From Swiss-Prot:
EC number: 3.3.2.9
Transmembrane segments: 7-27
Enzyme class: hydrolase
Chain's role: Catalyzes juvenile hormone hydrolysis.
Tissues with expression: Developing oocytes, fat body and midgut epithelium of adults.
One CC-aspect GO term: endoplasmic reticulum membrane
Compartments it resides in: Microsome membrane; Endoplasmic reticulum membrane
Encoding gene per record: EH1
Record keywords: Aromatic hydrocarbons catabolism, Endoplasmic reticulum, Hydrolase, Membrane, Microsome, Transmembrane, Transmembrane helix
Protein name: Juvenile hormone epoxide hydrolase 1
Organism of derivation: Ctenocephalides felis
Reactions it catalyzes: cis-stilbene oxide + H2O = (1R,2R)-hydrobenzoin; 1-(4-methoxyphenyl)-N-methyl-N-[(3-methyloxetan-3-yl)methyl]methanamine + H2O = 2-{[(4-methoxybenzyl)(methyl)amino]methyl}-2-methylpropane-1,3-diol
Listed InterPro entries: AB_hydrolase_fold (IPR029058), Epox_hydrolase-like (IPR000639), Epoxide_hydro_N (IPR010497), Epoxide_hydrolase (IPR016292)
Family, as annotated: Belongs to the peptidase S33 family.
GO annotation terms (biological process): catabolic process; epoxide metabolic process
Amino acid sequence: MGKCCRMLIFAAIAGIAVLYYQITKELPKPNIPLDTWWGPGKPQNVDISIRPFKININNKVIENLKLKLNDVQYTLPLEGINFEYGFNTDSLKKIVDFWRTQYNWREREALLNKYPHFKTNIQGLDIHYVHIKPQVSKNIEVLPLVMIHGWPGSFVEFYKIIPMLTTPRAGYNFVFELILPSIPGYGFSQAAAKPGLGSTQVAVIMRNLMERIGFKKYYVQGGDWGSMIISAMSTLFPENVLGQHSNMCFVNTPSSNIKAIIGSFFPESFAGTGNAHKMYPMSEHFFTLLEEMGYLHLQATKPDTVGVALRDSPAGLAAYILEKFSTWTNRSWRSVKDGNLLLKYNIPELLDNVMIYYVTDSITTSMRLYAESFTKAHLALNLDRVRNHVPAACAKFPNELAYVTDCQLAEKYKTLLQSNDMPSGGHFAAFEEPGLLAEDIFTAVKKFKEFYSKKAESQKKADL
């Protein structure tokens, strides 16, 4: 081999090494302002008190809804097509008919008001949240836990799991005080009047909300956008977050993606025998995701355009939202006539979630979170490459949209204390499998507490 060839090979190896270092090195935590004003106009003095809130929708809104439901125009579905093209029209007719003739909003409204609701102004926006304080004996420790929903969900998703997390259970000497906020622009939380409110900025609002309520330290939990927001909270505010639990663990770094590609050559060794099919073959999963991500491209680019149609048509809104509750719960349900919606849910609870979007006119503003989180400026924050040292736990439900191995998660989460492959369930874990999720949260927080106890003991010995 000639000297010139050896030099070229050496240069190539050195170049690859430098490139690998550049794409894998830890990045510093970005400086995110804590007081950005997201309300209309210039910053001003506002009422920062915590105000009790009760859902009480004007009768005119409900009457207008009924008028629209009585005048829905349908397109005949294709022969032999179930949910492959989206929400099947024959199934939609049944949902709309129930909504029009049997769904009683006032009864459902009373159910939603079962727990205390509040609003408070954070950075110019009135933020809504549900706050549940458990009534337990003095020997039971009460731990603050903020649970953050995603799209197209809402705080309604958590109603089944509330009693499971606030009631003492065998083997644990603690329960949770729950704070369930609505993301800005979702439901009863005011939407930003200015561009730029991405998931990272929402994390700042949630941190400020918890401080307003009176918590300096707390645990966080979330799925979908909630998982992105709590990850940002843990990354930016490790002094506040004691531990994070996610039912949609995700990381998107160059090195984690390289690992996934290398893993495709020995999938069972990389992902595990029982999980390899959730990642590989990569081409098959890529096209499946491509099939399901059309909504994301629309919402990340033109949310206001699609929002006009969804805001004006309650039937269209229901179809758009409930199709996700079918396909994201189990992708195989696309081949079922009714999307198997009623296999895990009932129509009233599904419509409760749709109604939160309808009565608050928040479908457009909710979708803007996609547009704001996929801007060049937001992506340039590169939070996935800022290491997160807060104790973390991951509940991997088998029908989640994507599977990520612990090897990949380790790129981001340096203190991953628990990672469980769940026996059943999909994207909407709290709504579909509240019992499984609740138990996983309890076991995770128990490990978090043990982690801090051992850390304190080690520090105590070191100080002697």
